Regions:
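Extended beta-strand/beta-hairpin segments
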Residues: 1-44, 53-134
Length: 134
């Protein structure tokens, strides 16, 4: 399996990215007209883990009504200012979702199923928290 994406430079520090012939989104190093490259990476991690969380909970017959994720990426002070830690805070709502099951779904997503997480440095700490709403 191979994923293909295409990126076009607009002459500044902005790029339009997406699948060839598909929908594009703006990536902006200054984060003025779109997320920065690092923001895009953090969004990819949030989206990837969220897909898994929703699927895992659906298999338990406890469908998610809403899900939001706030992501904090701590960065090194020196160039290239790589990520040194990530915190994912999941806010999940759905009738009948038990805390233990939501926590297990997040743990499995972060440690086993998310291909974005698995593609990052295994020594990069990725922590998570859960806010569960009825």
């Amino acid at each position: 399996m191979v994923n293909r994406v295409h990126l076009t430079w607009d002459g500044e520090h902005r790029f339009d990215a997406g699948r060839p012939g598909g929908v594009t989104h703006r990536i902006d190093a200054s984060a003025r007209t779109g997320p920065s490259p690092v923001d895009t990476l953090l969004n990819a991690l949030a989206a990837c883990t969220s897909v898994d969380v929703v699927d895992i909970l659906a298999k338990r017959r406890t469908p998610v009504r809403s899900l939001e994720v706030d992501v904090e990426g701590a960065r090194a002070a020196e160039t290239p200012a790589r990520l040194v830690g990530i915190l994912l805070t999941f806010r999940i709502a759905g009738a009948g979702i038990e805390r233990v099951h939501a926590e297990r779904a997040i743990e499995l997503a972060v440690t086993k199923y998310c291909s974005v997480r698995d593609s990052l440095d295994p020594n990069l700490p990725v922590r998570w928290a859960l806010e569960l709403e009825a």
